[in-house]
Each structure stands twice: as structure tokens, then as C-alpha cells.
Amino acid sequence: MGLEVLEALDSARTQWYHVTAIVIAGMGFFTDAYDLFCISTVSKLLGRLYYFDPSTNKPGKLPPSVNNVVTGVALVGTLSGQLVFGWLGDKLGRKKVYGVTLIIMVACAICSGLSFGSSAKSVMITLCFFRFWLGFGIGGDYPLSATIMSEYANKRTRGAFIAAVFAMQGVGIIFAGLVSMVFSGIFKAYYQAPRFNEDPILSTQPEGDLLWRLILMIGAVPAAMTYYWRMKMPETGRYTAIVEGNAKQAAADMARVLDIEIIAEQDKLAEFKAANDYPLWSSEFFNRHGRHLIGTMSCWFLLDIAFYSQNLTQKDIYPAMGLIRQDKEMNAIDEVFQTSRAMFVVALFGTFPGYWFTVFFIEKLGRFKIQLVGFFMMSFFMFVIGVKYEYLKDENKNLFALLYGLTFFFANFGPNSTTFVLPAELFPTRVRSTCHAFSAASGKAGAMVGAFGIQYYTLDGTPRKIRRAMMILAFTNLIGFFCTFLVTETKGRSLEEISGEDGRESELTATPNDRAPGIRQDSRTEKM
């Protein structure tokens, strides 16, 4: 029982409109990544500027509680935004709320840089307030961008298109390092200062207060540039037809987009909707889709514990790898420069390639294999780093950097990408955005465990604690490896076939062997 508008979307050739959709949705993730990760390049500068205590003979450092809130509050906002906008995306439509997320991101990125106050505490409170709402807007982009790209794409290249949107996160991380490096390089040239061990007071340039504000505010630029084009996108044909029940409008919108003639099938649509009218909170939904929802939520939760722990604590790992000097050997702005340069190098050679390997291979290898191998390799490399941490830190920094980079590579050519793709494919249209939001919010809950738990535990940088943290993260990834068996391969099939909306056998009733990629492909055509 297929609708012509859905079949047209599934069989459409790849054309310029698909590329445009990738860029528009992807630029949101570029902004998301920049805003979430640029804080890592300036958090030590905030400590030097606002929390220097001359009696310690050490550079100022954010207190553990303040550091956790500054770096983690955006994650709390992101989780909230995912749930709210994911639900709204199903209730009101993807397009109606898509522009709101961008407005919030632009406004709060600018306001983060304008954080004010007469004391260190008041500045941090203001900064955290705006970064919470920045995260709220960022969170809304997760389910909406994934769902929109999933519903626009054809079934042959859908995974690659969704992964390409998410891969812009890698570009955003690189850009966060690059912008911080360029701006701090300019400031370092114009506002020279002695190192901390030469003059603790003069080593912190007052101009650094302008530097961190500029770095945070730059995040508003790419989001603002795409607002017009985001508002020009029509509602997805699947939402218009299946949820709103307007076959005529769906056919007209998609005919204009795909440049083909599509017949509106209103009578057939009524039959289609009647067969798929069970609510989200029902036993029928959980019988059909509960295992997949548990799988996507648990895998994303476990992945983000490790992924965000690494990203948010890498500024503390870099000195151990020899990528930057010890803090006493630098002035405040030089520390920003060296931290951002190290972040840029690791992202360019470790983080960025993994995203695009997923884009190029996801339709060949499938989501299941990529996620399985990614979790396993992350667990292996983190285990090696944990066991040999002192040796790597003291005697083989090059190997340390290689292993650390490989964990990022296999995170992104692995579960960091596939946990974003799978929830956009596994669930019915009328709850797709909400289910993606549940999965993404579960991931952000894991990120908060990393930000508030692992980061707090390793904040003092003692080798024993970092070693233990790496071992914990290795075990976490191993659990993610086994949780992957709760999801199924979606490669090469329509969204309606995967979710059972077309009346065929739901994947949730398939045997465990059917879940493995490349096995019993003939089961796709079996009837209930």
C-alpha cells in the first residue's frame, strides 16, 4: 500500500535540491558544534581572568563547580530543546518550528559574548544563563534537521545525506579551533605579555576579556546566514501527507521540488492513515518499536559519555601529549592560541575524517556494521590509553597522540554518526521527530555524565584519575557495542517499509538474524 508521493521521494534521482537541503540543515550543525565546543578553547582564559589567586603561585583556574556549569550548562539546554522541539516537530510540523531554533541560536550566541556583571560570579551566571538558552536552540536542531533530511532523501542515499548533515559538526569543531587560533594569534601579536612564571600578574592580558567574547559571538554568523533559506524550504511531503492528511498539498510541494508530476491520492491516503493510527504511548507502539527505541537511546547515551568526556577534557589531555606547553610557561592569550591550535590539529586529522568516512561508506557497509566496529575500536583504544597512560605521557607522546586521535576517528566513523542517523529512519512519520528527540536527549544525558562526572573527576589532571577515567570509558563503549544489537539495519529500504507503515512486516517482528546486515534480504518483501 504505497502512496505515489512517497514512492517518488524514494526513487528520486539525487539533484541540486538535495544538496541545498544538506547545506541548509548542515549549517545548523556547523553552528551547533562551534557553539558547544568553542567554550573549551576559552575556559582556561576565563579562569585566569576571573579566578586568579596570587597566593597559590598558579595561573587562575575555574573552580570545579564553576567549570562544570560553564562547560556543561549548554548540554542541559540542549537536552531540554531536543525534547521540546522534537515534540513540536511532530505536532506543528517540521518547517513551522525549524526557524525558531535558528533565531534562538543567533540571539544567544551574541548574548553569550555580552555577558555582564560587576564580579566574577555575576559574569559566570550571566554567561551560563545565555549558554543554557543557546543549548536549547541547538537541541531543537537535532531532531528537526535529522527528520527533515530523512524525509526528503531517496532510499538509496538517505543514510549518506543524513550523515552529511551531521558531518558538518566536524567542520564546526575545526572552525571553533581555527577561529580561536586566528583571533588569539592576532591578540597575541598586538598585546604581548610575559609568561606566567616570569610575571604572574602581567601574564594575563586584560584584552583577553574581549577575546573570549568575540570567539563566542562568532557562532551567530553562520546561523544568521542560513535563516532565509531555511524559511524557504517547504514542509516535508511525508509530514504533509501522512500526518496532516493533505495528499494534494504534498503532491504539489514535492512535484515542484523534484520537478516531476505526482498524482494526489487522497482516498488511498485515508486508508494509509487508518492503518497507522496508534499513539506513541500505546502498547502497539512499544510492541512494534519499543526495542528499537531502547536501542537508539541506550547507544546514544553510552556513546556521548565517552565522546563529550573526550571533547570537553581534551584541553587537559593536550599538555600530557606534548601538544601544548605547561600553563606556567605561557601567558593567558598564548594558552588560548596553543589550546585552539591543538584542538584544530586533532579535529582536522582525527575528528573530521571520521565523519566523512561515514558519509562515503554508510550505504556500502550499513549503519549496523559501522556502529558495531566503531564502539569496539573506541573501547580498544581507550583501554590501551588507560593501561599505558604514564608510559604514553612520559615516553611516547607521538603514540599517545595517535591513539587519542584514533578514538575520535572511530567515534565519528562509528556510533557518533550512526546514532544520529538511525532514529531518523526507524520510527513512523507521525512520531519520528519525537523518537529522535528521545534518543538525542538520552545522548545529552550521557554527555552530562561526561561533563559533570568524568570531567569533574579528572579536573586536577592527576595521571591516576585520568587512567581510571579512560578505563571506565572503555567499558562504557563495550556496553554500547552490545546495545547495538537492539537496532536493525535500515540500508536501502523506504522509511515506510522500515517502520511497517506500508503494511508489510515490521522489522520489530524479525528474528535476530534478520537484524544483521546482509542476511535474509528477501525478508523485505514478506507480508504480515
From Swiss-Prot:
Upregulating conditions: Accumulates in roots, in a RAM1-dependent manner, during colonization by arbuscular mycorrhizal (AM) fungi (e.g. Gigaspora gigantea, Glomus versiforme and G.intraradices). Induced in root tips by low phosphate (Pi) levels.
KW rRNA-binding (keyword) present: no
Positions of region (Disordered): 497-528
Cellular location(s): Cell membrane
Stored InterPro entries: MFS_dom, MFS_sugar_transport-like, MFS_trans_sf, Phos_permease
Tissues in which the UniProt entry reports expression: Mostly expressed in mycorrhizal roots. Also observed in root tips of non-mycorrhizal roots, in a phosphate (Pi) depended-manner, highest expression levels being observed in low Pi conditions.
Catalytic activities: phosphate(in) + H(+)(in) = phosphate(out) + H(+)(out)
Disruption phenotype: Impaired phosphate (Pi) starvation induction of lateral roots formation. Plants missing PT4 or both PT4 and PT8 fail to establish arbuscular mycorrhizal (AM) symbiosis with AM fungi in high nitrogen conditions, leading to premature arbuscule degeneration (PAD); these phenotypes are suppressed in nitrogen-deprived conditions in an AMT2-3-dependent manner.
Origin superkingdom: Eukaryota
pH dependence (UniProt free text): Optimum pH is 3-4.
Pfam families in alphabetical order: Sugar_tr
Extracellular side: 40-68, 118-122, 180-208, 314-341, 393-401, 455-468
PROSITE patterns documented for this protein: MFS
Compositional bias segments (type: Basic and acidic residues): 497-507
Membrane topology per record: Multi-pass membrane protein
GO molecular function: phosphate transmembrane transporter activity; symporter activity
GO annotation, biological process: arbuscular mycorrhizal association; cellular response to nitrogen levels; cellular response to phosphate starvation; detection of phosphate ion; lateral root formation; phosphate ion transport; response to symbiotic fungus; transmembrane transport
Keywords assigned: Cell membrane, Membrane, Phosphate transport, Symport, Transmembrane, Transmembrane helix, Transport
Cytoplasmic compartment segments: 1-18, 90-96, 144-158, 230-292, 363-371, 423-433, 490-528
GO CC terms of this entry: periarbuscular membrane; plasma membrane
Transmembrane segments: 19-39, 69-89, 97-117, 123-143, 159-179, 209-229, 293-313, 342-362, 372-392, 402-422, 434-454, 469-489
General remark: Although related to the sugar transporter family, it does not transport sugars.
Function, in words: Low-affinity transporter for external inorganic phosphate (Pi) probably involved in the acquisition of phosphate released by arbuscular mycorrhizal (AM) fungi (e.g. Gigaspora gigantea, Glomus versiforme and G.intraradices) during AM symbiosis; required for propper mycorrhizal arbuscule morphology. Acts as a Pi-sensing machinery at the root tip level, independently of AM fungi, involved in the regulation of early root branching and lateral roots formation.
Protein family per UniProt: Belongs to the major facilitator superfamily. Phosphate:H(+) symporter (TC 2.A.1.9) family.
Name of the molecule in the record: Low affinity inorganic phosphate transporter 4
Source organism of this protein record: Medicago truncatula (Barrel medic)
Species lineage: Eukaryota, Viridiplantae, Streptophyta, Embryophyta, Tracheophyta
